[in-house]
Amino acid sequence: MHDIRLIRDNPHAFDAGLARRGLAPLSAEILAADAELRALQTDIQAALARRNEASKLIGQAMAAGDKDKAEALKAEVAALKAALPAREEAERAQLAALHDRLAALPNLPADDVPDGEDEAGNVELSRWGTPRSFDFTPLEHADFAPALGLDFETAAKMSGARFAFLKGPMARLERALGQFMLDRQTIEAGYTECATPLLVRDDAAFGTTQLPKFREDLFQTTDGLWLISTSEMSLTNAVREQILAEADLPIRMTALTPCFRSEAGSAGRDTRGYIRQHQFWKVELVSITRPEDSDAELERKTRAAESILEALELPYRKMLLCAGDMGFAARKTYDLEVWLPGQNAYREISSCSNCGDFQARRMNARFRREGGKGNEFVHTLNGSGLAVGRTLVAILENYQQADGSVDIPAALLPYMGGITRLTPLG
């Protein structure tokens, strides 16, 4: 959510930020609506002040025996009172319209975010690991993983496309991945493990910006609750409508949850395999910080995600997203892309973003500095640490063997109960 005061103070900078997002200038339109709202508010305040003044004058006129003046004042008070509901309704309507207009606009990119319209404008910052040299042609996971227990056909019979039914050691491996990630993020990166609701209300989905823009990407229950598309929704909203103590910051939270996405805008993309599912597991990393700490926190968070890939010995590259490719709420984003030999390509496995105070304004999440006056909005950050299903895919493709089996990465062996390799199910 944008601060209208910043738009008033520097409309040109606001329009420049929108332009970097590929949007037309809107400051003039927004400021005109803001001026209309303030005029309505001034009119209401003036009417209330005059009503109070006239009410006092009635008593004075009565005391002076001036009945005509008293009656005229009574009529004026009655007229002011009668007109007030319409004025207040006009104010509410204008306030709602301005709120909705601002809520529909994305966050503005940070100064160090590169310009660009789409993923072609993203900047590769670094690479880690050397892709494995195979002595056979590596396959995409969709071509060999079903024999190992990644069953798409059974899932399709009961749920349709973009679902999977995992069996035996394959299911154990996915569970091991989630537990391994949680252990790393809590023990080594200092995140507090949380178990969150999987269903949230409208105001929570609005706070983390899934609503209203991404309504079509969510699943909604018949009683109006929304299935979370990421536990960012529930973790970040843990501080909504709160005033935190400065000493309590930063807050770092993590959760391993199933996530649910309709993938309404992904028709025809990744229709094979386990890359893009309606239901998937993910470890989310959320941070709540002071404004001056959020840039460093983004680096720390991204490093925590990178450490998982390195522990699993999965080659990856780090990308700085351009302004046109960032998510709606982000002011700066790093993507981590893991190497998939079966696709001969790097694919996104984690996205780590600094949202500044954009979500905090929507949630009214603030903090008070020690010895300070007034409250400030916190900064919120989120990132995947990691997407479990995509990490499973990366292991399947990078650790596949010529006979169709898959070796278990050394880091996961303590979680696998003695299983060292996935082999075709009998």
Swiss-Prot record:
For this UniProt record, give its keywords in alphabetical order, as a comma-separated list.
Answer: Aminoacyl-tRNA synthetase, ATP-binding, Cytoplasm, Ligase, Nucleotide-binding, Protein biosynthesis
GO BP terms in the entry: selenocysteine biosynthetic process; seryl-tRNA aminoacylation
> What pathway or pathways are given for this protein in its record?
Aminoacyl-tRNA biosynthesis; selenocysteinyl-tRNA(Sec) biosynthesis; L-seryl-tRNA(Sec) from L-serine and tRNA(Sec): step 1/1
GO cellular component terms, A-Z:
cytoplasm
What InterPro entries does the annotation carry?
aa-tRNA-synt_IIb (IPR002314), aa-tRNA-synth_II (IPR006195), aa-tRNA-synth_II/BPL/LPL (IPR045864), Ser-tRNA-ligase_type_1 (IPR002317), Ser-tRNA-synth_1_N (IPR015866), SerRS_1_N_sf (IPR042103), SerRS_core (IPR033729), tRNA-bd_arm (IPR010978)
Q: Which family does it belong to?
A: Belongs to the class-II aminoacyl-tRNA synthetase family. Type-1 seryl-tRNA synthetase subfamily.
Protein role: Catalyzes the attachment of serine to tRNA(Ser). Is also able to aminoacylate tRNA(Sec) with serine, to form the misacylated tRNA L-seryl-tRNA(Sec), which will be further converted into selenocysteinyl-tRNA(Sec).
Protein name from the UniProt record: Serine--tRNA ligase
Whichever gene encodes this chain, its name is serS
